[in-house]
């Protein structure tokens, strides 16, 4: 058996070391630990097989029956590792404790720290138009429904949206996300609280502006930090399904609003962005007098899958959930509700050891802060828009219309 070093394997594949590690985390390639326990080796035959399949044929680890089997998209935006997610080389869990969501977005887009002139402000005229359109929706419409409608309205108010320059893409996204948040109805009147990160006290953060539109509670510094941390952790996750949809849109040279609309459409599926709503309903059931164990038992009796546990890319546990739950436990002022969250985790763990995933952690944040069930998808949509645009910008540097998949008769 011929073994290659990490650098040798990456060179043969024509990718960076970080991308090779992402292949490992996605199960596309195996690795052999070196004797020192710190470095890895890769079987040359397996590396060569991937090189061949990139010219056509399936890659191990693809979904069975996938029409895009064998497709690997090189990216510098985000890589997945067993110990966590990295945004352009930065550990996302560290970013969640030390950076605002806005700074994280700027880093994902350009790999640079934002300058003092960069603002995330909304246009009051555009916000008013978005609010008017939003009010036309039926009373039972979900918050993500409002986001999709308002995105189209905000786009129509930007005659320069077809400017393909990266700086124009980024400017449009800043104003869009700010307007989407500011157009949501307030659940807690008053000015947004200050976000505290270390010694910094930040006024007008997107996390604070979103908090007062989702929660009726006044957050303590730790709770608002958990909200910002959730947005940071969710900002990107490599080539999730919605991100692939955005890259396809960008390959047609769609404008930033259309790219985000593409992502929002894919995110609407119950297996993606709205997965946290099912966890929220479980937590509500667990808050009844019978308690968490009874709520889990009732789901099992109905033959339902317990939502919010396990992740195919993280067999040893989702590091995003660990980071977010740590932030939440350190801050939770609503101890009774946090105890219910812990009770669900313990009840599931007694039946079969399973680690919570980021959907569970996101639902826990919303439940503890007394947000509505669709708050998780709303936070997810706003946060993931940052990563979508990072991938759209990267895709704009590639050949256009490169995702032309051939059709064949069904067997």
What residue spans do the PLM features occupy?
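Hydrophobic alpha-helical bundle cores within soluble ligand-binding/oligomerization subdomains
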Residues: 2-8, 12-411
